[in-house]
Amino acid sequence: MSTLLNILVRDASRAPMQHRDEVEVSLQSGLEGDYRGTRENRQVTVVVQEAWEAALKDLGKDVPWSARRANLLVDDLNLENTSGQTLHIGDVILRITGETTPCPRMEEACAGLQNALAPEWRAGASCTVIEGGKIKVGDSVRLEKETLVATG
């Protein structure tokens, strides 16, 4: 079973990432306190710990996952080619809208990181909120192939 390991938000572009132990998630604004939450297909971004570690192994570097600037870190999950599937985290349901493409900003964190994140969805997935609620570090995470529509 996959677990939510970490939650990060930022209140503006290029702002420092801020750790949260728990956060409210809504259809209107994504993660409370995160400025990207109003983007229709990219309200929440998710990275898998093992994918992040694979990228770092290729680089031979040790870089904190917060350098990815994604919102959620989960473990024991394969997000590759999961567009349209749903992630269930606690009571929250997210629909995966696509792969998160690693941006040039990754090179600022570590030379070569952008290319190391490119294969196999290592940079993570972008999601939209289907069902809001509260999530907290330690919540179980489940990937399902169902197709759901936002209800709020």
Predicted regions mapped to residue ranges:
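Metal-cofactor-dependent catalytic cores
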Residues: 1-152
